[in-house]
Regions:
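Conserved phosphate-donor/acceptor-positioning beta-strand/loop module used by diverse small-molecule
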Residues: 98-119, 156
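Conserved glycine(s) of the Walker
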Residues: 13
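Walker A (P-loop) ATP-phosphate-binding motif of ABC ATPase nucleotide-binding domains
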Residues: 3
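Hydrophobic anchor at the beta1->P-loop junction of P-loop NTPases
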Residues: 6
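Conserved substrate/cofactor phosphate-moiety recognition/catalytic segment
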Residues: 16-66
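Glycine-rich phosphate-binding loop used to anchor ATP phosphates in small-molecule kinases
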Residues: 53-106
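Small-molecule kinase domains that catalyze NTP-dependent phosphoryl transfer to phosphate-bearing small molecules
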Residues: 120-169, 180
Length: 180
């Protein structure tokens, strides 16, 4: 199984691009906020229980998806301070041990555009960060740095590339569709 690991700051367009990539590839989408929202119904964000269960669920889904012979899975991820050190290496090992491979895709976007996107209605569907002052504070504190991230196979600036074009670039870079 190919795990397409899309990461970037909040509001960089991870879910929107991932949805476009699903339309191209037919791969399943594992949106990070599904797990986050589940756990927020019981635990406070960042609590030890939240952090441990979030990682356990992520890794379990990756392993089972590989073992189930899915051709591919698209995962959205926002590096941040509550992700345990070593998660990326544990994820890589879990996927490899189950016979899968991981491709990292980074979405970047200038801060003014990220702040503009914070209040969009699409961010309200999940319990996503929508407060610009809180985003600024967290960014200033380095909260969106989760340590080691492997070099991305592709980095896309979503302020100058539409979600559909971004998904097409990803699909082409990963040889998921023929290059015309």
């Amino acid at each position: 199984m190919k795990l397409i690991f899309i990461y970037g700051l909040p509001a960089s367009g991870k879910l929107t691009v991932a949805q476009e990539l699903v339309a191209i590839t037919g791969y399943k989408l594992f949106h990070n906020h599904l797990v986050v929202d589940l756990l927020l119904s019981v635990f406070e964000f960042g609590s030890p229980e939240f952090v441990a269960l979030r990682e356990e669920i992520w890794l379990s889904i990756f392993e089972q998806a590989c073992r189930s012979q899915l051709p591919g899975l698209i995962f959205t991820f926002a590096p941040e301070a509550t992700v345990r050190p070593g998660f990326i290496n544990r994820m890589l090992r879990t996927v490899a041990d189950a016979g899968g491979e991981v491709d990292f895709i980074e979405l970047i976007c200038p801060l003014p555009e990220l702040k503009r996107r914070m209040g969009s209605l699409s961010r309200l569907q999940y319990k996503k960060l929508t407060s610009v002052p809180l985003f600024e504070e967290l960014h200033r504190e380095g909260s969106f740095e989760a340590g080691y991230m492997p070099k991305a196979r592709l980095s896309i600036d979503t302020s100058i590339c539409t979600p559909a074009r971004s998904a097409l670039q990803i699909a082409r870079a990963l040889d998921l569709i023929p290059v015309n």
